[in-house]
């Protein structure tokens, strides 16, 4: 039986309707936290052609809320655009209205796109930075003051091994993830005297619909000479355990960082890559 170590806590999870966000939301609920999830939904229309992302339908958001409630926790689901301050504030208000507070903030929402620096679209650059980095700032700005006032809080930011390693033709994504590490450390130092921690998790490749969107594009670039599973297996071959990361593994790490007993872990970047060091 899972210990309800987060009972009485309330969480906000961006990107919570799918992938890592969903896995983290369910892990928090398993440990007793009420969870508000926000995602940019497919009702806004298709994602930009050059971006690798997954826009969930409203049904996915509702389904995750039902999964949270099935674990004995409260749930709220919202359409969320982290590029807009008013959308972030509405999501925060919905969580406060439902649970009375936000103790835990998990920032997951993000997009990816590949373009070389030479000729890189400025609008694409700005959109990736605005989503992946500025979005984390906006949610943190909304949640941090009350955490400090109450003397307890946990913020977990999903970064990426791309922040440290870099990736060819992926400057905006890598820059945004590096920026997340800097933001994480600054927030950690601001919150530390008040019982608030802020840490980052940097996964390698995670088995999500967003990854598979990238794989489809990579396969097309090489002429679709192999299947998605064959391509993912080729990625996994470079990992020490010969498999990529599952979303639930990220959920477990995030839930651990939110425990009372994790208060000494602050301003850290935890790599989850099965030991791959590149």
Task: Write out the residue ranges for each language-model feature.
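Substrate-binding pocket helix/loop in short-chain dehydrogenase/reductase
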Residues: 116-117, 121-129, 235
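Residue(s) in the substrate-gating loop at a strand-loop-helix junction
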Residues: 160
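Short, small/polar-rich loop/turn modules that mediate ligand/substrate recognition or access, typified
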Residues: 192, 197, 265-267
